[in-house]
Amino acid sequence: MTQIKLPLRSVSQINQYTKCPMAYKLARIDKVWQRPAAWLPQGTAFHAVAEAVEVWESYGMPLTLDEAKDMFRWHYANDVGAFTEETPNFEWWTWSGPYNGQRDIERRYTVGLEQVEKFFAWRGTPGQEIWVTPDGTPAIELYFEIELDGILVRGYIDAVVVVDGELRVRDYKTGNQPGDDFQLGVYALAVAMTYGVEAPKTGDYFMVGKKGKAPKPTKPYDLTKWTREAITEEFHRVEEGIAASMFDPLPEPDKCKFCDVSYSCPVFK
């Protein structure tokens, strides 16, 4: 019997296609060179530290602030090195305001260490209560893979926390606040389908805080509109567009300015 391979998707793929189908095609199908940006290693390094902080806390062996900062330094240097190996000319990196690639790497190293410090301070006031899954796993960087009517959806949930006795999905953000709650809605559904519990009704983004700004979660989003049917419909909408090779560009000045595949885009050129 022939086994049919199901398409494998993620929230980031859905968001990228919705934002600009041409960018999706260039990055995911054509696999063109992608322009690096210093905020990428900053984000991944912070996420690695935040995960480690919560994991070691759950073991009763909390990390010290100095250990967490050293961990950030290692991850940041490692990720910057990988990007630099592929794109050694910093002038080809994405600028952040007046900062070119090299200056932004230096700046975000400092910003990232400050964010680690702020995360530590926030956790002590009193921070967050991490949910423990039915199988005894702390809900930190939870992997999931669910099927939505013939489409496999997978990803990682930064944290599932307990607020006033109820579950809430949480995603850490080191940059700007997202403009929608679709990502959180998918995470809530994934928690329900994976662990057989009621889907969390709310979710939030933990804004780590840009330089000089205090960290805090956003106001909770009401996720009850993101039913399994609504989320499935969204994934299938994008899947149908990909299958039909519908990759029309959706150019806008702000989007194109920060698009990491714009140098290969026929419209941008």
From Swiss-Prot:
Matching Gene3D superfamilies: 3.90.320.10
Matches recorded under Pfam families: PDDEXK_1
Superkingdom field: Viruses
UniProt-recorded name of the protein: Gene 69 protein
